[in-house]
Each structure stands twice: as structure tokens, then as C-alpha cells.
Amino acid sequence: MQRRQQQKEAPSNQNIMATILGSIPREAGVTKIEYEGPRIALYTNTPRYLLEHNEIISNLVNVIKKRIIVRIDESVRKKEEDARKMLSKLVPAEAKLQGTFFDTTTGEVSLEAKRPWLLQRNSAEFSHADVSEKIGWTLRIRKATTSQSSTMQVINRTLRASSIERGKQLKQIGDDIFRPKLATRSEISLTALGGFGQVGRSCMLLSTLDSKVLVDCGVNPGAAHPSESYPRLDWAGITLDDLDAVVIGHAHLDHTGFLPVLAKYGYRGPIYCTEPTLPMMNLIQLDAIKVATAQGRVPVYAERDVRQIMRQAITLPYGTVTDISPDIKLVLANAGHILGSALCHFHIGSGDHNFVYSGDIKFGKSILFEAASWNFPRVETLLIESTYGAKEDIQPTRQEVESAFINAVNGALADGGKVLIPIPAVGRAQEIMMVIDHYMKSGEMAEAPVFTEGMISEASAIHEAHPEYLARELKQKILETDDNPFDSEYFTNVEHADGRDEALRDGSPCIILATSGMLEGGPVLEYFKSIAPHKQNKILFVSYQVNGTLGRRVLDGARQVPLMNRGGKIEVVNIECRMEKLDGFSGHSDYNQLTGFVQKLRPKLRRVLVNHGERRKSENLALAVRRMFRIPAHYPQIQESIKLF
């Protein structure tokens, strides 16, 4: 008997509505049932009943195998201004409510509070059912950040302005997802369009007889020619209208940098990602426009294309099964790489095949994130990255690298020097901030002012707004106590060039975190000019320095470098300070962690594919998997198509 026949079948899409109507009691006050993208929305004019009898929805989900959400009917919603006034009285003062956002498309109101734990407990003092019944809006409790994220504010404004358009779009997406299957058999293939045999422009097409899903859509910023810079969508043999969905694993440009171009040329379908990935990728994509313009290049997309992505994005939490096409379900799981990074688990057909795309993963816990998830019920095919896939790619343990970091910083501060840390704004900067805060509080690192500049503050605000995606201990600190490391007394954000004077004042030891991580532009260069000529100072590199970058030249021993001053003239900077490079803070798994991840999945796997690495490293990891685990392993090349089932 085939696997699909063995599984308990859910009702057909035509019978779903009838099943729901037959299962909901009259007391629930359901006024209408609509598709809302990949979900089915039940609208009610008596929200308390379903909120207090949530087993009704749970039982329905088990029967129909679809996501169901409860929405409050528009007829009982209070006007926003009235609801806001009521909330100001209903929310306990000690929760420190900072702001509200009303999403008219979904009927949800987000409450941003300094002490969200006082609102999440659903206590007698603050009952969600009571409040929702009074104001006619469903509640979402959010952590209010120390400084507001301008990126998230722009997203909220964009969502409000496009509310009617989004509502229509979500209904159309639902119609497309829940359309009848046409194929009576399964054929599944994966086509490599970028990021195979290389790092950069990650992109692939997952195809069945019923569906076409694009997974990641990145760029290769270092490539000299467009044919090497962008995904080879011309090889996919499809139009943008053929796509059922785009799925994004994480926010970095090598995975999302070409996504605005899809919007520019007419893609209007759903874009699935985790909630923090949306603001993170918008931040990075908009910054890429600024960088291209500053370098005299014409950006391949405009700000309006990034805003269009905001309208099309459907954000998903970890661990939630979501229909994204008639025959593909998606589950996102923690990848441990950067904020919101996700492994993508595709359940295809009626149990025919399960495909997991690792994206960029860190299979090791850090102070910022939990280790990548691995406990999938079924995985027949795994596609795994190989950034550090060579046998010699072994990183020190976190304990070792944090100890080395403490010693490097303490030594420079003890000599009366300044420590400049060139750093990427997303991920690495927040991890170093958490390490500094932790060890200064414990007394293992000398206390000194810590200055940050660049996009670090904005990226940190996005981290702070999504504590549920952080390591367990850090999440608990932010959500359940007043001890918020992102609001540490040690940190000062430099918002304007005039603010650098305090950090650069003579005889004042300090730590400076500034972008960019490779000394290729950004405010770090202004600090570099002042810090490099003095022997007591130190430049501490904690991220990879690519060949040809200023960071690599400095690390390799350059003693003089020409830089442009504010007047537009070239000045020579003498380098007398000390240099140090620390490995181990990487957001990628090393060789041992990659093979360890495969080991965890070994009993379920039938095939391993390898991507996202230099060809030599991808080949080495594939050979290691075959040798160590006796599992077929292959490292595809761009334009190759692999039959999965």
C-alpha cells in the first residue's frame, strides 16, 4: 500500500467549509469564514466564546489539517481612537505600555509594553478575553524596545496604507493554495539557480506537477559580471506568474538581495519568512541601495520595490505547519545563524517526500541563539550548507573564543588604549554586545564605555523586539525581568559624527563597535584613522576578512593605507596599533558541527545534497557524508536539476 493511502486523509478543500460549519456551535457567533493566505479565518461577533473554548479550534485543526485563526467581526470593533483610550485604562500602569499598532487587515492590535510579562500571563487583572470583548480587537503582546526601530515603523505604516490591497491579496492567495490538485501522482525536482559550488546568490526552484516554489533569492555582491551576480532565473523555464510562493531562510543579501527585483518586475505572490526576517531583510536591502549609490553604481531595485515586499510578506513562527500550495506544506525551524534564520522543512504530497533545506546554520549554542533545530519527524532529502565544509575547518569552542576575546580587550584597556572592533551590523554586533555586557557584569572584563555606530542600533532594536527568537536565557531576561542587556548602561550609540569626539578623546580607554566589518566604508573608517596611528590601541577583527578588502590588507600587515578624508582628498594613514583576529564567533557551523548535524538526522535520511560553499568544500563535505554515514551525497552545480521523488 502506498504511503499516501496509509495516512488519514483530511477533508477535500471543497468540504472544508462544510466541516467547519458543522463543527462550530451556534454560541460561537461565527459570521463568516474566509481564506486569509495560508490560513482559514473564522469571524465571530462573540469572541469570548472561542477564546475560552479553544479546544473547539484545536479539534477542528486536527480534522481538517489546516491552520485556523479566530478574527473578531468588523461590526463589533471599536474605532481605533476609542480602543486606544480604553486600552490606556485597561492595561496595568506597571506594564508600562509604550504604544499600539492596529492592523485593520487582521483585526489585531499589538500592545508594546516595557514589561510584557505582566500582560502575557492572562491574569485576572488583565484577561485577554475580557479586553478583546470590550474593544473588539484581538490582542498581541510585544516587547517595547529601548529605542524604536525605524524599519519596523515603516513596515507598520506600509501595512496600514495597503490594508485593503492586502486583504484582497490574502483571499486570492488562499484561493490559489486551496485549489484542487490536478496531478494524480507525485514528481518532485530541485533546480539549482545559484549558491551551488559557491557562496552567494542562493536560489533554487522546488517543483512538483502542481506547484512551483522559489527558495531564497540572493545576490553575489563580489562578482564582476551580472551573470555571476544574480540567480539564473532564466534557466528555470518559468515566468513569475508561475510561482506559487517564495520562501526566504534568512535576511542576508546573499539570500534575499535579488528579491526586490522580483517585485520590480511584477511578482505579486506570497513571500514566506519568519517575523524578524522581514524587518532585517528590509534594513539590509535598503542599505544596499545606499552603498551602491555611494559607490557610483546604479542600484538594480528601488526603495518602492522593498516596500512592495513588505506588502507581500507572510510571516510565520517557528514550528507551525503551513500550506503554501496545493501539495506542499512548510515548517520553519530555528537555524541558529542570525535573528529569525530558519531551516525550511517541505512536506510534499500526501507524505510522499520530506525535504529540508538547512540554509545557513549554526549547530552550536551561542550567547545570542540556540543551536539549530534537528528533530524533524521525517527527512528523506537534506540540502546542507558547506561554508566550512573542509576537514580543516575546525573552530574553537565558544568558551575558548570568549576567553580569548576577554583577554584581548582587557590587555588593550589596561594599556590605556582603545579597542576598535569593525563589525557587521546584523548578528555579529549583537553577539559581541551580549558578550561584553555579560563579562563586564561578571567582573571578568574591565569596565569601560562601549560606543556603537552604524546600523548596529537599528539592528539591535529589531533583536530586542523579537526576544522569542533569542537564546532561552536571553529571552527570559528580556521578557520576564527588567534586566535587558540591549539597554545596558555600558552602551552608548553614536547617532551623529559630532558624537565621535567622546569616543576618540585622548587618554580615555574604550571599546568601539562600528560598521562595516571589513573596513570597506561606513563610520568605522573615521575611527580607524584616529586609532590606527597609536601603539596602545588595538583593532580586533571578529569576522571574516575577504581578500582584496582593506580589512584583509591591514590584517596581513599593511603599515600604511591611503584613505579619503572629509574634504575629498587622499590622506595616508600610518598603522602603529596592534592587530588581532579571533575565529569562533561565526554564525556558520564548522566541519564537526556540519557532520554532527547529519549524524542527528542519519536514521531518516535517504540522500544529502551540499551547497553554499566553495566547490572544494562542498565536494569534501559530500565525500565525508558518504564515507562516514553511508548515505548517498552529491554537490550539485548551478543549472543542475535533481529528481527528489
Curated annotation (Swiss-Prot):
Zn(2+) 1 binds at residues 250, 252, 337, 360. This is Transcription termination factor FttA. Residues 10-77 are annotated as: KHa. One of its GO terms (biological process) is DNA-templated transcription termination. Residues 587-645 are annotated as: Metallo-beta-lactamase C-terminus. It holds the Pfam family Lactamase_B. Binds 2 Zn(2+) ions, which are required for nuclease activity. Zn(2+) 2 binds at residues 254-255, 360, 612. It comes from the Archaea. Residues 187-391 are annotated as: Metallo-beta-lactamase N-terminus. Residues 78-146 are annotated as: KHb. Keywords: DNA-binding, Endonuclease, Exonuclease, Hydrolase, Metal-binding, Nuclease, RNA-binding, Transcription, Transcription regulation, Transcription termination, Zinc. Its EC number is 3.1.-.-. It is an enzyme of class 3 (hydrolase). Belongs to the metallo-beta-lactamase superfamily. RNA-metabolizing metallo-beta-lactamase-like family. FttA subfamily. The gene is fttA.
